[in-house]
Amino acid sequence: MTINRLLAFSLLLVATLHCSFVHAGEGAFGWIYTLDLQPKGKVEFEQRLQLNQQQAAGTYDALTARTELEYGLTNDLQVAGYINSYYTSANQNYTNPEACGDSPTCTGGYGVPSSHDPSTAYKKSGIEGGSLEAIYRITNPVTSPVGVGLYLEPTWGRNKDELEARLLLQSNFIDDRLILAGNVVVANERLKFIENGNVPESMLDFLVGASYRFAPKWSAGVEARFHNDYSELNLRNQVQRATFIGPNMHYAAKDWWVTGAWRYQLAGGTCMGGGEAECSNARVWDSHSVNEFIVKVGFPLN
């Protein structure tokens, strides 16, 4: 599967399903989960495309596609299932001597196997795997000063298995036109594409953002990610720290919605604890990049 086929398949799914949709959902942020859940018995289709682009040098393009169905089990409990696919293209994108040795550049990064010749380009695409998701809303931001929810997502994939949990926080202001939201994200992972195919990692992220509805159907805002990576499970031995920030834009029509967002990695990221090979130019690499773009489209099915 090439990147063009991946995009074409996603667009075909969106176009085909759009013909039968008669209502609209909301997803105002790019990466932050909110507490706007599907009501009991409602189903929504969502397609996400994320592109991570540009590392220390050369070229690095990592596209991930997530095709999702969400279902409201109750008014406060939503479940979902994903099919995940990917496209990775890397060529001389690393510059750190700990990764490249005597060569000024080499090919590396998330998805590039340890067995790959770092002097040559790498390109691969395919179905990554699947995910399940559950969100439980404890308090509703529409009726309470602060909305609180819990999120759990196991993922099984070709490149990694992961168990991710989130604490979801949200407050609405100015007749719900202004949304402030935050996620505390904790994840344990096992990477399959490097070393023996069973490499543990963990992650702690803080996501914060704001979105303001400035016109009918239109919202815009900003979101930030404060990222921490660890080389062992359960947040032991920190190896990365980085900060990302950027704008988002959201449009909601009667029978569909779309959100686009961009995050830029600020200079000042650091690597430590044996993870120094993943850093250069005051930024962290691995699965990260200078620019991260995301587009999400949603259509309720009933």
What does each model-found stretch correspond to?
Residues 23-207, 211-302:
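Transmembrane beta-barrel domains of Gram-negative outer membranes and organellar outer membranes
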Residues 1-9:
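Bacterial N-terminal signal peptides that target proteins for export
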